Amino acid sequence: MTEKKPIRTLLCIAVLQNFFDLPFDQTGPVWTATKQFLAAVHKMPGVTVLGTIDDDETMVGTSPTGFPWTCYLLGDFPDREAVVAACNLFRTIEVGDQGHRLWRYMRIEARMGRPLPTPEL
């Protein structure tokens, strides 16, 4: 039997206008929920998180629709269902005590594929 290869996945996360409309002293719960999301993905069975990046330093190249993405998580997921489950966390993680979910303040997109071969140097 052939061993099932993990799916290399890039989770792209964008901060929505609802976050920017919050008074500064009310943004903390969104960051707390974001950390909860990251921790949950790290703990998912069969998921290996390879790295994260917040692109608030510099972006090089064109972005025809502005700056849609804010941060990224690159990981190997055991299957498509695990990727869907990770994205679904935005629907279930609560932000603060107002009954809002993380997806009110951020959106997520998953890009699934395979690693490129590493060139021999």
Give short role names for the model-derived ranges.
Residues 1-69, 77-81, 111-121:
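Short S/T/G/P-rich N-terminal loop/turn motif that feeds into the first structured element of a domain
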Residues 104-112:
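Conserved catalytic core of two-metal-ion nucleotidyltransferases
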